[in-house]
A protein has these predicted regions:
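Short, structured secondary-structure elements
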Residues: 1-177
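Substrate/cofactor-recognition hotspot
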Residues: 1-20, 146-289
Length: 289
């Protein structure tokens, strides 16, 4: 920039920076903090329930910023891409905002999280208090809270596990209580009354793109036993070495104290032959010269 002395240097620098893919990555970090994006979710053992494909939402945020997509359109896609653009697989990634809050053990927790995160991110309000009572100092009533939550009540999330590869069709089969039970495509409407006229074949969701090829991978023992990994062993050895050095440093003053005790003991006069000093309180020792 400093070397460009031609007129319009500032505008060219701005255009160059805005056209860089790094622009979307830089500002996506800001918006992902507001929209509460994270690769893992949960605490301790709950980490295992993290959304495995949540990174697709992250990429959608970056792509949207680089494409200069309008803020209103981004909000529409995050909250209702499955309704606003059901055939747009790129836009469907935006619904990661809703999936990010999913809590498999309680639907109420999930929906309350959606309301909380939506109000904070898009309205600049905290509506948590209104979940149980009308807000004390903000104009948000108990009724307002559940009217907003009602918007998300019909939303549901499928997290079916995918099984092994079907070698004949090279497709993934979803395990169910009955493997032969047909699967029907649910687009919208009442989930309890699906259209059973057109069954669909088991396959990878189209949004994931391509075919999922599963191959057997032979892993070393360290993959099953983390304690065998070099980094873990080095850490354990370093901790043990530290304890050994600490023990050695404690032995040195103890040895010095032992020598002092021996020297002090040697100054005492030995007891006369046949007369021993007793440490019994019931039998006093004979007088010593």
């Amino acid at each position: 920039f400093l070397g460009d002395t031609r007129p319009g240097a500032y505008g060219r620098a701005v255009d160059r920076l805005l056209s860089s893919p790094r622009y979307g990555e830089r500002w996506a970090r800001h918006w992902m903090d507001i929209w509460r994006y994270s690769d893992p979710s949960g605490f301790q053992k709950e980490i295992r329930d993290s959304r495995k494909h949540i990174w697709r939402w992250r990429d959608w945020i970056i792509d949207s910023l680089n494409a200069d997509k309008g803020y209103d359109r981004m909000l529409t896609e995050m909250l209702a891409a499955d309704e606003a653009a059901p055939a747009d697989t790129a836009a469907l990634r935006a619904t990661g905002f809703l999936a990010r809050n999913w809590y498999k053990f309680s639907r109420n927790v999930w929906l309350d999280n959606i309301v909380e995160h939506s109000s904070k991110a898009f309205l600049g309000l905290t509506m948590n208090c209104a979940r149980c009572h009308s807000h004390k100092y903000d104009p948000i009533s108990h009724k307002d809270y559940y009217q907003l939550r009602a918007v998300f009540e019909t939303h549901n999330l499928r997290d079916d596990p995918l099984g092994q590869t079907d070698s004949s069709a090279i497709m993934v089969r979803a395990f169910d209580s009955e493997a032969a039970t047909p699967t029907y495509l649910f687009i919208n409407g009442d989930v309890n009354q699906p259209d059973k006229d057109i069954p669909i074949q088991p396959a990878v969701p189209r949004i994931l793109g391509g075919k999922l090829k599963i191959e057997t991978v032979k892993l070393p023992p360290s993959a099953y036993y983390p304690a065998l990994q070099p980094a873990t062993q080095e850490k354990a050895l370093a901790a043990t070495d530290k304890e050994i050095k600490k023990a050695h440093s404690a032995i040195q003053p103890a040895e010095g104290n032992l020598e002092k005790a021996k020297l002090t003991l040697s100054k005492f006069t030995p007891a006369p032959t046949g007369k021993k000093v007793t440490d019994s309180n019931s039998k006093p020792s004979p007088p010593q010269p």
